Amino acid sequence: MMGWKILILNHWKTMTTIDKEELDSLIQSEWSYLESKKSEWSLLEGKQDMEVLEHVLRCILHLDLTPEKPQEFKECVKVQNPDGGWSKESHTDKTSMWITTFVGLKLCRGNLILKDSDIQATVDKTLEYVLSMQEEDGHWSDPEWSHLDTTCSVTCFLTIYQVTQDKTDDERINKARIKGFDFITQWQRDSGLWKDDTFHP
């Protein structure tokens, strides 16, 4: 019986081992597939689901393709809502806090490379919107997500904003971020997990 276990374990190790060349090839293949579906995520191709787009922007960032694809970031500026946020669907004006923080986060990171003044103004406008929407107990809300999940995304955005904008000493942002962290901490269960009745991260 022990022999079979060793054989299976060795087979599993062989199956899960992948070298850098294979991994790079796999990543390139996946990116090529995404590129072939550009009409389904790029604002250059029309109206889009901003949740899908922000995930693709993360891929662009991770693959170091930002200098080659600046317009994918710049197009987000054009669909920002007047309040400083973004909607789930680019062609609507119902701002989603969850989407706003993730799009804002990608623009913060992308603009470290692009250094575009319009993107910078957009990110700054996003910050003002986010700060204005914090509730008294420290949370942020989004009708499609729990307060816990939304507040996690906002505190992440605020942290990235402070680091990328050299604003770690900004007391206004620090106060909001820490208040958000305190809200998150209060939701932790005795088991160590975070859980609420709306969504289970």
Question: In which residue ranges do the predicted regions lie?
Answer:
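Short, conserved catalytic or adaptor-binding loops enriched in Gly and charged residues
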Residues: 19, 23-26, 35, 78, ...
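Buried hydrophobic core positions in alpha-solenoid tandem helical repeats
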Residues: 30, 34, 76-77, 130, ...
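Serine-hydrolase catalytic machinery in alpha/beta-hydrolase-like enzymes
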Residues: 85
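Intrinsically disordered, low-complexity polar segments enriched in Ser/Thr/Pro and acidic
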Residues: 25-47
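An alpha-helical repeat/solenoid feature that recognizes helix-turn-helix modules
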Residues: 1-21, 43-71, 88-125, 136-178, ...
